[in-house]
């Protein structure tokens, strides 16, 4: 019987360890997917406009001429916009719980026939029960993030309402690895400044990813066994 229980315990630990290894490996694979020259982040080529026939025979084509008084804001597929990264978040949370409960129950002396209290060795029969429980919990969390810089992105698509879908990435090759920034989202044309820049807090549905690859990034990554002990799979 003891050998059977021991075998079941070993099986349970083996399954838990296998799940932890699988989870750790899946996280590693997810991080390694970010590689340079990703086709999903390839440069967007401008759409080719159909050549319009000018019936007058003139060589002047107003459709391809930019007004000298017009601004240089991006508004077509393939145009480039500079996004100024100015992200800062701060979150604080405090939780405090204190519970107290006290119960007390007394039973009067047991009486017999004629209302005479029943006694044993001269002591009357009576009962008393009391219970006292206390619980106190205190939790505090404080987290902050900031990201500054700039990245140039392409206009991926022009929506029917005039909004622009943007996408782009920037890779920095360092001695011990690569650092990259990726950004996707939707912006309004009127939020673009006259110098063709826009703040990152004006980007709707923004997905900003800043990470790195290489030995420097690996040194800051927890091992799979450490992840297991810090995960919810660890029962203690």
Curated annotation (Swiss-Prot):
Biological process (GO), any one: bacterial-type flagellum-dependent cell motility
GO molecular function, one term: cytoskeletal motor activity
A Pfam match: FlgH
Keyword tags: Bacterial flagellum, Cell outer membrane, Lipoprotein, Membrane, Palmitate, Signal
Membrane topology: Lipid-anchor
Any one of the GO CC terms: cell outer membrane
Keyword Membrane: yes
Quaternary assembly: The basal body constitutes a major portion of the flagellar organelle and consists of four rings (L,P,S, and M) mounted on a central rod.
UniProt-listed HAMAP family: FlgH
Protein family membership: Belongs to the FlgH family.
Name by which UniProt lists this protein: Flagellar L-ring protein
């Amino acid at each position: 019987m003891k050998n059977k229980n021991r075998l079941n315990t070993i099986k349970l630990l083996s399954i838990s360890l296998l799940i932890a290894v699988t989870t750790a490996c899946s996280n590693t694979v997810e991080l390694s997917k970010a590689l340079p020259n990703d086709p999903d982040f390839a440069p967007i080529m401008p759409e080719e406009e159909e050549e319009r026939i000018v019936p007058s025979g003139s060589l002047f084509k107003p459709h391809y001429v930019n007004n000298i008084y017009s601004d240089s804001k991006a508004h077509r597929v393939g145009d480039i916009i500079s996004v100024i990264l100015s992200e800062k978040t701060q979150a604080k949370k405090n939780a405090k719980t204190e519970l107290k409960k006290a119960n007390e129950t007394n039973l009067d002396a047991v009486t017999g026939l004629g209302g005479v209290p029943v006694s044993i060795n001269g002591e009357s029969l009576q009962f008393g029960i009391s219970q006292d429980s206390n619980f106190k919990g205190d939790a505090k969390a404080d987290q902050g993030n900031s990201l500054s810089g700039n990245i140039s992105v392409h206009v991926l698509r022009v929506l029917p309402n005039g909004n622009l879908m943007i996408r782009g990435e920037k890779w920095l090759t360092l001695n011990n690895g690569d650092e990259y920034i990726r950004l996707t989202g939707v912006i309004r044309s009127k939020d673009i400044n006259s110098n063709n820049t826009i703040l990152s807090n004006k980007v709707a549905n923004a997905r900003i990813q800043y990470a790195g690859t290489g030995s420097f990034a690996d040194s800051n990554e927890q091992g799979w066994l450490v992840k297991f002990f810090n995960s919810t799979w660890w029962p203690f």
